[in-house]
Amino acid sequence: AWQFAELQMTAQANGWAKFVSMQNHYNLVYREEEREMNPYCLSTGVDLTPWSPLARGILAGSYQGGFGGGSTDRSKGQDRQRTEGLYHGDHVFPIAERVIEIAAKYEKTPAQIAVAWLLHKPGVASPVVGVSKVSQLEQLVAAVEIQIADEDVSYLEELYRPVDNLLSIGFS
């Protein structure tokens, strides 16, 4: 966050246009941005446009039971290795299972619940989603209308564990 703040100050000092949005990595299983970047952006009026809101399919239910349980061509193919490098930790699949549980409660898809959670967070303007079908995009757009109860938000969030070593994560 300090580097982004430095860029903002440099832009201001030189009369340049400042950044108005931050495209950061943020979802239910990767919430490191809550430490510094999100609060900085919120306090300075910079909108968040998080990428990977579905954690490369994990939060959409594509890997039920673990990485070996891939249910899509992408989750069974070479992308699986990238996903494993980016999302690891004992909290990942239990959180994904809670997303599935809450989705059933609201009669929505897990992907819709993951995006609705993100849209519930302060400062999030719009997540950057990736889809392979028009129907998936339509479902995710419909997530704008979903209101998740505070107790369900807490239930989704309570298993998260911060990453001990940020250098240990992979790249998307």
Name the predicted role of every residue range.
Residues 1-36:
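Glycine/proline-rich, positively charged
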Residues 4-7, 41, 59, 140:
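Hydrophobic packing residues within well-ordered alpha-helices of enzyme cores
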Residues 10-15, 38-40, 65-69, 144-146:
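Short, hinge-like loop/turn segments at secondary-structure boundaries
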Residues 17-23, 47-49, 125-128:
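Structural preference for beta-strand elements that scaffold enzyme active sites
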Residues 22, 41, 48-51, 99, ...:
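Conserved, mostly hydrophobic/aromatic
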Residues 26-30, 52-59, 117, 133:
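Glycine-rich beta-alpha junction loops
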Residues 31, 43, 67-105, 120-124, ...:
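Terminal-tail/helix-coil boundary detector
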Residues 32-75, 109:
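Aromatic-lined glycan-binding groove of carbohydrate-active enzymes
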